[in-house]
Amino acid sequence: MGFRIMNRNISYVFPNISTFNRNGRGGLHKRYKIAVDHGCSLIEVPADFVKNKTEVQLTGKKLGSVLSAQDIQKLYESGTPSKNIKYILHTEPQVSRRNGKGASCTPQLQWNNQKWVRDFANMAISISKIFGVPPAGIEIHPGGRHNTYSDIVRSIITIRELFKNSFNTIPFVVLENRTGQIVSNGEQIHDFWQVLLFKNKSLSKDVGIVLDIQQLYTVTKNDFLKQLNFIPHESVKGLHIHCKHRTPSVENKIPWAKVFAWIGKIKHKIFLNPEVHHHSQAIDTISFCNEMMKKHPTTTSQDCEKHATRNPGH
């Protein structure tokens, strides 16, 4: 039974739960059915590099390798249940991977290398082609300090152009804040946004941040609310809602009531991804979000907090 969405400006993403990835990465058919059953208008689909022992065996590639078109055929189920399906490709997050034999690998995101960026985009395009329908959006991650904010903005432009050339449509692109990467706290999100506006203000409608609340809390702890309030509301296109990839609770250290009060001040349409690993937890997390939004409905624009003005660091 589907959920009644509590806010017309909110869409839900059905997350990439573990059951979809038992022997490969699955496809759109099963994800779509479950998403529709639970009132989710968007679907999360993995688009990482080779990430585990099973994928090493299926592709014959090393951990952290970019997928070829042939690899993609081995990992994904083809086709789509609907030409109107909306899915988000969740791309390589630059995390440590293990092959089951003690070896590990952490692929490096190279936004400063335009050849690498094209290879990255072409892999995402090949995944989309096996489905026969382009993604609504693409989620990317900041990477290490060898990248700059300008590198990321330039890469986003390249990715969008390549998708336009392949599908004659352009996906939205969101950047997730990640612990240990160059965009992890509120000040860095603020500075990245300022660079994006300076480089190409027209991007701001379809490019922005997907704010992972748990990641922000992990990085900031006692400064969490201060850092949250550095983030321009207009930069946020979506949020990941979870507590260490489990269903949140008001008993968590994360001050969820204040988080949802902050979310309520966002005036444009956004998506919420209950980024957990199990089906039941996804449903419980959507219920949690609906309950929190009942208590913290959208406020008027004059109530919005003003953000500190800072000079971009990149």
Where are these regions (language model features)?
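N-terminal pre-domain/capping segments
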Residues: 1-118, 204-206, 303-313
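Histidine-acidic metal/acid-base catalytic patches
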Residues: 2-11, 30-36, 80-81, 113-129, ...
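Active-site beta-loop-alpha junctions enriched in small/polar residues
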Residues: 15-22, 46-50, 92-94, 143-145, ...
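Hydrophobic residues within beta-strands of alpha/beta enzymes
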Residues: 43-44, 136-138, 173, 239, ...
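Active-site groove signature of glycoside hydrolases
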Residues: 124-147, 177
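Hydrophobic, well-structured mid-protein blocks that either form specific transmembrane helices
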Residues: 152-181
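Basic- and aromatic-lined ligand-binding clefts that recognize polyanionic substrates
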Residues: 171-202
